[in-house]
From Swiss-Prot:
It comes from the Bacteria. Keywords: ATP-binding, Carbohydrate metabolism, Kinase, Nucleotide-binding, Transferase. SUPFAM superfamilies: Actin-like ATPase domain. This is Anhydro-N-acetylmuramic acid kinase. NCBIfam families: PRK09585.1-1, PRK09585.1-3, PRK09585.3-2. Catalyzes the specific phosphorylation of 1,6-anhydro-N-acetylmuramic acid (anhMurNAc) with the simultaneous cleavage of the 1,6-anhydro ring, generating MurNAc-6-P. Is required for the utilization of anhMurNAc either imported from the medium or derived from its own cell wall murein, and thus plays a role in cell wall recycling.
Length: 369
């Protein structure tokens, strides 16, 4: 069974950077050694945002974006190797999620698409890459998402305590770690995505630091109720979503009914939307004793306070409190999934994704010997 140093690379729906994590992984433990966040150039970020909102590209433009993202991921890996004084031979493999540009797991021809050419990463780092993690699960009737609950279960499940892990990235997703029950998990809806999109358009800021804008505003209850009427929120699990659905266009359609509102009030309402949709799903799933939050949303003081208020009797903490960096959780998960793929072990959980069976995930792009 393969063990040793692995690197995980994650560029999520929030597009706030490329997260790269170095870890030692074997069948007994996952030990994080180092991490860094690598910036995404504004031009690349905008190109991804455009395609996620349905802007048409030529095949040439799409191919260039795929190559540019692959090079970006390779640069991020090489920066971490240099920082840690490591060589390619010191790493077993890279687990690279890729950049999701479309996710449509239902319908006549279900599909998901993550780009960032893994061949570029192999060529520029000299390290074997495991990528394309989601499509095997979709081929078996699943949603291909979320995949991280399997990792949450391996690291954070407790024999007697009802726990849930909440990742608040661009999209928020919940892992249900309930003793005596199959692991559950699904996307609850928007996490930081709509908040980030709004303040970017209104103030040119990538995110609402310390929730300053949201805390200066007031929740617009009619707007909140209008957004909560979206059918996604009442869909049963398994379910997954992404930027192709919850994007700035979605927000604009709801705002048409509310002209002239204060931008800070909209920011406050979007924060409340995230908190309410998450807390409702926690309660519908039977509640928990401890809710452990990871992802960028864990640094949003307003979100954390609202979750605690909406979930009385639940201890709301970040995963940092149990020794796992919330900022690095997803990248670490894909390093772990790469290890499982090379070990020939399944990486999905049918109880989470809805797939017909467990399966080894991903495609292997081997480095030259």
């Amino acid at each position: 069974m393969k063990s040793g140093r692995f690197i995980g690379v994650m560029s999520g729906t929030s597009l706030d950077g490329v997260d790269v994590v170095l870890a030692t992984i074997d069948e007994h433990r996952v030990a994080q050694l180092a991490s860094l966040s690598w910036p995404i150039p504004v031009s690349l970020k905008q190109a991804v945002l455009d395609i996620c909102q349905g802007q048409q590209l030529t095949l040439s433009q799409f191919g260039q974006l795929d190559t540019q993202l692959g090079r970006l991921f390779a640069d991020a890996v090489n920066a971490l190797l240099k920082e840690q004084n490591l060589q390619a031979r010191d790493i077993v493999a890279i687990g690279c999620h890729g950049q999701t540009v479309w996710h449509e797991p239902t319908g006549v021809a279900p599909h998901t698409l993550q780009i960032g050419d893994n061949n570029q990463i192999v060529a520029r780092t000299g390290i074997t890459v495991v990528g394309d993690f989601r499509r095997r699960d979709i081929a078996l009737g699943g949603h291909g998402a979320p995949l991280v609950p399997a990792f949450h279960h391996a690291l954070l499940a407790h024999p007697t305590e009802r726990r849930m892990v909440l990742n608040i990235g661009g999209i928020a997703n919940l892992s249900l770690l309930i003793p005596g029950q199959p692991v559950g998990g699904y996307d609850t809806g928007p996490g930081n995505m709509l908040m980030d999109a709004w303040i970017w358009r209104q103030a040119g800021k990538p995110y609402d630091k310390d929730a300053e804008w949201a805390r200066a505003g007031k929740v617009i209850l009619p707007l909140l109720q209008n957004m909560l009427s979206d059918p996604y929120f009442s869909q049963p699990a398994p379910k997954s979503t992404g930027r192709e659905y919850f994007n700035y266009g979605w927000l604009e359609r709801h705002l048409r009914h509310f002209p002239g509102v204060d931008p800070r009030d909209v920011q406050a309402t979007l924060a409340e939307l995230t908190a309410v949709t998450i807390s409702e799903q926690v309660l519908l799933s039977g509640g928990c004793e401890r809710l452990m939050v990871c992802g960028g949303g864990g640094r949003n003081p307003l979100l954390m306070a609202r979750l605690a208020a909406l979930l009385p009797g639940t201890e709301v903490t970040t995963t940092d409190a149990v020794g796992i960096s919330g900022d690095d959780m997803e990248a670490l998960a894909f390093a772990w999934l790469a290890w499982r793929t090379l070990a020939g072990l399944p990486g999905n959980l049918p109880s989470v994704t809805g797939a017909s069976q467990e399966t080894v995930l991903g495609a292997i792009f081997p480095a030259n010997p």
